[in-house]
């Protein structure tokens, strides 16, 4: 999916919501535990309930890998289900990969060839040769970690050099030598607030994947005020605030209502550019 197609979906649905599929076997409704594949059963119900209101899904690989082979099977089934039934949805493998070149090449093959996923999150710490293998796939996206929403982001990402330049700013500037805004996005946490203003000075046209609204306390209004550009430029993720709002047999309907509420807020924000 290219940048223009992504923007067209945003305009059509009046939404830039990404639903995070951080599916924890210990948190799904009890009645699903009797299913042969409870993780997939939960994901399928969530996807069917929320697809009208979002433009992307983001399975977090850690939740699937923690279950071994069964978890990976559930992940693959989830990806295939979304592609077959909701082909307009942008799929993000939240894997945070990044290693020496030949290892990154294998990661890229996994997500882009074997699974045919639209995008993957990548850690930039090891530099250009750890990222470029992911960029060799036409039509696929790298979503590079820039400024995350966790407390530990202060340990490295916000440290300054002698000239006052912060590490995340170096990442943004250097990585633009590797790919343009048709192939690279950046992760910027919703809790970073005014930092979006600084980020847009460096990458005015790139899409930003923004986790951290909902359960993590980020403000959608603030993200849009400082981060939205003329083509929206935002994919805002909510995981727990949608998929875990209810643990009864009505969980899917509750997730749909939660997604609809966020979409309605996003529709208001989009009036500024549409």
Swiss-Prot record:
Residues spanning the signal sequence: none
Pathway: Pyrimidine metabolism; UMP biosynthesis via de novo pathway; UMP from orotate: step 2/2
Positions of the catalytic residues: 96 (proton donor)
GO molecular function: orotidine-5'-phosphate decarboxylase activity
Keywords recorded for this protein, A-Z: Decarboxylase, Lyase, Pyrimidine biosynthesis
Methyltransferase is among the record's keywords: no
Reaction equation(s) it catalyzes: orotidine 5'-phosphate + H(+) = UMP + CO2
EC number: 4.1.1.23
SUPFAM superfamilies named among the record's database cross-references: Ribulose-phoshate binding barrel
InterPro entries listed in its UniProt record: Aldolase_TIM (IPR013785), OMPdecase_type-2 (IPR011995), OMPdeCOase_dom (IPR001754), RibuloseP-bd_barrel (IPR011060)
A Pfam short name: OMPdecase
Biological process, per Gene Ontology: 'de novo' pyrimidine nucleobase biosynthetic process; 'de novo' UMP biosynthetic process
Top-level taxon: Bacteria
HAMAP family recorded: OMPdecase_type2
Entry's family note: Belongs to the OMP decarboxylase family. Type 2 subfamily.
Name of the protein described by the UniProt record: Orotidine 5'-phosphate decarboxylase
Native source organism of the sequence: Bacteroides fragilis (strain ATCC 25285 / DSM 2151 / CCUG 4856 / JCM 11019 / LMG 10263 / NCTC 9343 / Onslow / VPI 2553 / EN-2)
Gene giving rise to this polypeptide: pyrF
């Amino acid at each position: 999916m290219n940048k223009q197609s992504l923007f067209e979906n945003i305009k059509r649905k009046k939404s830039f919501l990404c639903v995070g599929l951080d599916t924890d076997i210990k948190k799904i409704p009890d009645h699903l535990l009797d299913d042969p594949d409870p993780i997939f059963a939960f994901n399928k119900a969530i996807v069917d309930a929320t697809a009208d209101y979002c433009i992307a899904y983001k399975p977090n690989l850690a939740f699937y890998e923690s279950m071994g082979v069964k978890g990976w099977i559930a992940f693959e089934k989830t990806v295939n289900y979304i592609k077959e039934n909701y082909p307009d949805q942008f799929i993000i493998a939240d894997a945070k990969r990044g290693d020496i070149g030949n290892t990154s090449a294998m990661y890229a093959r996994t997500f882009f060839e074997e699974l045919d996923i639209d995008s993957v999150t990548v850690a930039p710490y090891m530099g250009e040769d750890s990222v470029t293998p992911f960029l060799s796939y036409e039509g696929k996206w790298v979503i590079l970690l820039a400024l995350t929403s966790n407390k530990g982001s202060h340990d490295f990402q916000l440290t300054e050099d002698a000239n006052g330049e912060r590490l995340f700013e170096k990442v943004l500037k250097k990585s633009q030598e590797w790919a343009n805004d048709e192939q690279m996005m950046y992760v910027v946490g919703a809790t970073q607030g005014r930092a979006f203003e600084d980020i847009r000075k460096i990458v005015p046209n790139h899409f930003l994947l923004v986790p951290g609204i909902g359960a993590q306390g980020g403000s959608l209004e603030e993200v849009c005020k400082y981060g939205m550009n003329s083509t929206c430029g935002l994919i805002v993720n909510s995981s727990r605030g949608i998929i875990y709002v209810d643990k009864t047999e009505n969980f899917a309907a509750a997730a749909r209502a939660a997604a609809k509420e966020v979409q309605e807020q996003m529709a208001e924000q989009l009036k500024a550019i549409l």
